[in-house]
Curated annotation (Swiss-Prot):
Its EC number is 6.3.4.21. GO terms for cellular component: cytosol. GO terms for molecular function: nicotinate phosphoribosyltransferase activity. Keywords: Ligase, Phosphoprotein, Pyridine nucleotide biosynthesis. The gene is pncB. The keyword Metal-binding does not apply. This is Nicotinate phosphoribosyltransferase. It catalyses: nicotinate + 5-phospho-alpha-D-ribose 1-diphosphate + ATP + H2O = nicotinate beta-D-ribonucleotide + ADP + phosphate + diphosphate. GO terms for biological process: NAD biosynthetic process via the salvage pathway. Disulfide bonds: none annotated. It comes from Serratia proteamaculans (strain 568). The modification Phosphohistidine is found at H221. SUPFAM superfamilies: Nicotinate/Quinolinate PRTase C-terminal domain-like, Nicotinate/Quinolinate PRTase N-terminal domain-like.
């Protein structure tokens, strides 16, 4: 099987933009902090048989390095400082940080080391796992098949949206981590760029570079999770994370993720200063209509015009769900829809993987994601979940996975 000895990943930038945006903030603020992250398959699929092949790809990742052209590209963007880019130029993946094993048929992966390095593994490694599994399960699928299905969906979208002013609809590709393959993502995003006028960007830095699209993404759950152990007082940790992000990016990348604890706990922390300075909020779990109404009501309560803010929806979206949300909200707030798996792994006969890699420890102590969807809660330490719920004044119920 020599075809599988070649690397799936060929660019250090083949990852989500928010990884570099967060990595720079960690590089500047928390260079000495260590973390651990673990792989979770949210379904009951047994992926352990692919461990050796995934391990071989992990070893190949150590060869990835920023090219001169990529360095110049990042230097031309408004987000990055010179000290970070010079460090990133020397960055190499260290496969020693990754433990991978086939545990009775289940795929076990744990990544540990300095946060500023570990932060880079999640997205490309998930993309590798997804591509390895799909090329075994669906060896005959081609990018052309994915594009044909996309064109059907775009035609359907056009028909379904004909009775509404769609001019303010904005789509972002968020599909790197669970894509069928790199070739499929490239074909899908390239097709959207040429055929769908509402595409405003991609989360993938390599594709943004190649296709001349806006790179999009701010921070992930891990930013808030790590602050649970960085902040001296647990109850202040979310505010500390929000403030540290503003300190790094005072007037850009200002979309805040709301569901690390829960939306209600987030809004209690998201007072007038934060609400004015952040450009908007991102939804990633729970009922999106209810969430959007809460966000709009919160801005109004603070005397802020919701039309000056943006809501980003990114939880398990497809074009139909995005259109329903657009119809509901577009006259009251700015909207962006981040669609991932339903763009880059939406091919008839192919079952996408429901896989994640999440932070589980910071400074050797537990961190948790509670979220607005019980099935998305992640933490191994029940005592810590209890402490977190108490600190954020939440009922002590939902069990962690």
């Amino acid at each position: 099987m020599t075809q599988y000895a070649s690397p799936i990943l060929t660019s250090l930038l083949d990852t989500d933009a928010y990884k570099l945006h967060m990595q720079q903030a960690v590089f500047h603020r928390y260079p000495a902090i260590s973390v651990a992250a673990e792989f979770r398959c949210r379904g009951d699929e047994l992926l352990g048989e692919y461990a050796d092949e995934i391990g071989a790809q992990i070893a190949l990742m150590s060869q990835l390095a920023l090219t001169d052209a990529e360095f110049d590209y990042l230097s031309g963007l408004p987000f990055f400082r010179e000290d970070y880019l010079n460090w990133l130029r020397d960055f190499r993946y260290d496969p020693q940080q990754v433990q991978i094993e086939n545990h009775a048929g289940k795929l076990h992966i744990r990544i540990a080391g300095p946060w500023r390095e570990v932060i880079m593994w999640e997205v490309p490694l998930l993309a590798v796992i997804s591509e390895v599994v799909h090329r075994h399960r669906s060896p005959d699928v081609t990018p052309e098949m994915a594009v044909a299905h996309l064109r059907n969906k775009l035609a359907q979208f056009k028909a379904m949206s004909s009775d509404v002013d769609i001019s303010r609809f904005k789509l972002m590709d968020f599909g790197t981590r669970r894509r069928f393959s790199q070739a499929v993502q490239q074909a899908i995003v390239g097709t959207l760029k040429n055929e769908f006028p509402y595409l405003v960007g991609t989360s993938n830095y390599d594709l943004a570079h190649q296709l001349d699209l806006a790179p999009v993404g701010t921070q992930a759950h891990e930013w808030f999770q790590a602050h649970q152990q960085i902040s001296p007082v647990l109850a202040n940790s979310q505010r500390a994370a929000l403030q540290a992000w503003l300190d790094e990016y005072p007037d850009q990348l200002g979309i805040a993720l709301t569901d690390c604890i829960t939306m209600d706990a987030f809004l209690r922390d998201f007072g007038p200063q934060f609400a004015q300075r952040y450009q908007g909020l991102r939804h990633d779990s729970g009922d999106p209509f209810e969430w959007g109404e809460k966000a709009i009501a919160h801005f109004q309560k603070l005397g802020i015009d919701p039309m000056s803010k943006t809501l980003v929806f990114s939880d398990n979206l497809d074009l139909d769900k995005a259109l329903a949300l657009y119809r509901h909200f577009y006259q009251r707030v700015n909207l962006v829809f981040g669609i991932g798996t339903r763009l880059t792994c939406d091919i008839p006969g192919v079952k996408p993987l429901n896989i994640v890699i999440k932070l589980v420890e910071c400074k050797g102590k537990p961190v948790a994601k509670l979220s607005d969807s019980p099935g998305k809660t992640i933490c191994q330490d029940q005592a810590f979940v209890k402490a977190l719920r108490k600190a954020f004044d939440l009922p002590l119920v939902k069990k962690a996975s």
